């Protein structure tokens, strides 16, 4: 198959991606591994740490999210925006534990100018001064705000598509798909890397998964980072009763993402704590080359650092070098 060559394409059709996704599993993994080896050192796995810097009270109605103010049955402690010195102390701790990227998430619908945004800029500058990559997820933003983030040295902005355009309305009604794409366009116009992926296991079809990947792969260039999340059902959210996905579904999604976006960093994200060591290794063989590292991802559990250290030692993983500051 030509896909094994790992050519960069922006013209994938949904049908092509569905066919690719549904290949016999070993054949799919073989193609994905070949593409991965052509564009990446297969032994390098980036470790990213994720911190919720402002928790709960979000006005969005995302069906999967415990931080939504719409889901009043969720037992979640709401917290105001953390102080920069507290965040930077945790970033230093994450770096000392081996993390190379520090991601900060605020449960906002959109960025608003003022003291809180200024505090986020201070956090970004501080993380970069530690020699780490800095990523934030803050919701929608305007051009002047993206410019300020770029000036602060922000490496990447996370803004996920979550799912396909066709299934999106079943999951979120308070923000349109077009809103998300506009935010991504603004971010990229200021030279900030895109961290953009989605979630599987929310009731979508295989075609929905392929459609989401098609939207991502049509971007020029492809997103620099593509997080692949498996739904973590949370009591009190509309998706609380959804069954856990089969780990091999996550393997297929990772492998397909790797083939259609050969140069992107594919990040194994939420839901990893439910995978045993062998399933995680299978995802890495299939093209994942980054994981979220730390005990908690925003408000959901993650694999423990000790478990991860044992995993990386077992596979001989090498560290990823943080991106340099623009002035360097």
UniProtKB/Swiss-Prot annotation:
Cofactor binding, per record: Binds 1 [4Fe-4S] cluster. The cluster is coordinated with 3 cysteines and an exchangeable S-adenosyl-L-methionine.
GO BP annotations listed: biotin biosynthetic process
Annotated metabolic or biological route of this protein: Cofactor biosynthesis; biotin biosynthesis; biotin from 7,8-diaminononanoate: step 2/2
Cofactor(s) required, per the database record: [4Fe-4S] cluster; [2Fe-2S] cluster
Record SUPFAM superfamilies: Radical SAM enzymes
This enzyme's EC code(s): 2.8.1.6
Molecular function terms from GO: 2 iron, 2 sulfur cluster binding; 4 iron, 4 sulfur cluster binding; biotin synthase activity; iron ion binding
Domain Radical SAM core: 43-272
Xref: Gene3D superfamilies: Aldolase class I
Keywords carried by this UniProt record: 2Fe-2S, 4Fe-4S, Biotin biosynthesis, Iron, Iron-sulfur, Metal-binding, S-adenosyl-L-methionine, Transferase
Binding residues for [4Fe-4S] cluster: 58, 62, 65
Pfam families: BATS, Radical_SAM
Catalytic reaction equation(s): (4R,5S)-dethiobiotin + (sulfur carrier)-SH + 2 reduced [2Fe-2S]-[ferredoxin] + 2 S-adenosyl-L-methionine = (sulfur carrier)-H + biotin + 2 5'-deoxyadenosine + 2 L-methionine + 2 oxidized [2Fe-2S]-[ferredoxin]
Amino acids binding [2Fe-2S] cluster: 103, 135, 195, 267
Quaternary structure and interacting proteins, as annotated: Homodimer.
Function: Catalyzes the conversion of dethiobiotin (DTB) to biotin by the insertion of a sulfur atom into dethiobiotin via a radical-based mechanism.
Similarity annotation: Belongs to the radical SAM superfamily. Biotin synthase family.
PANTHER family: BIOTIN SYNTHASE (PTHR22976), BIOTIN SYNTHASE, MITOCHONDRIAL (PTHR22976:SF2)
Name under which the protein is recorded: Biotin synthase
GN (gene name): bioB
